[in-house]
Amino acid sequence: MHKHHLSKKLFFAGLVLFIIGAIGVALTMNKGNMIEKGEPLTKQWDLSAENINSIAFSSERDVTFEWKESTNGKNYIELKGNYSANDKKAIQKLDPVSEDGTSFNITVPEEEDWYNGFGKIYAYGQQKVTVYLTKDTKLADLEVKSHSGDINVADFKVKKFVSSTNSGELKVSNLEANTAQMATSSGDLELSNMKANSSVETGSGQTDLTNLTGDLEVNGGSGDVNVTGVKAKKLKIAIDSGDIELTSGTVTDLAVLTTSSGDIDASTKGKVQAESNSGAIELAGITNDVTAKTSSGDIDVAFIKQVKNIAINTDSGEVELELPGDFKAIYEASSNSGRIKVPTSDSNTDNRVTVKTSSGDIKIEK
């Protein structure tokens, strides 16, 4: 009984100390003593009046990077944000502009102690970089990188665009380029309203791509890939783990969709190759040849016009094909364990439909 009362006393004593400590922390934070927001800085660098060869920016923190038309007839770059006193002094001393003014290369200095458990919380917030160029000034190369921060890039027209972040989100919108390379190691990636031949590398995180024009290649580790409104000659999506969704797309040559573990759902024009080791495949609005393969999962494909070759294979799963009423083909269907329903073959055509499943029903109907 004595031990029980002692335990209760110790518990309440600890609770009181915790409450007192919490109140102290709250009061300290309310006074602004624990949260360090840094000192505001606005810094501008003048560029050449001629075309700009390259702009390169690197930072540890979140950054918004955008283009605006210059209204004063000059080309220049503006950096705004809150920084520590030491970083502010260091930035003001930087000279990132090349001698001829056509190149800009900056790595924003960062103090290492963002959080000290016995000191302050450093909350400097987001940086903003604005590139002011006259209407007739052209920018060749743009590179934006961050080690552990989010990146948001908007409204640029360049020849080459490169952007990457190790652990942070990457967003790019309203960008036009000959080539665009984007990469995230751990973070979501979002691209919208872009005209470029684009390549995307992701480690883990969701990828959302909307209204892209140009050839597209996506290689990823784990995370879903959603593509809407793409217009491309060639498209390739290959991920280790995650679903692939392709909607309202026009791929005139070939769309290759591959996931080791996940479903594939696509609606696009052009040839399609789809493969999943473990997951269902559903294709709709198809207007060209299809090859679909899965080790374990159903395959459902709907065609809206005559095509020459359809090849479907699944080890374990049902197959259902929906064809136009005037579709003509020679049908070859086989299942080791399952029912088979196919139309009558037409011997006066070279079009072929080949469907194989080890275990599952096959249904082909017009």
Where are these regions (language model features)?
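Long, intrinsically disordered low-complexity tandem-repeat regions enriched in serine/threonine/proline
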Residues: E143, S164-N166, K171, E176, ...
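A mature extracytoplasmic/lumenal domain signature
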Residues: S59-R61, E69-T71, G81-Y83, V108-E112, ...
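Residue-level recognition of well-ordered beta-strand positions that form the cores
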Residues: A56-S58, E66, E78-K80, T107, ...
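N-terminal targeting/secretion presequences
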Residues: G14, F18, L133, K157-V162, ...
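Hydrophobic membrane-insertion alpha-helices, especially the h-region
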Residues: F11-L27
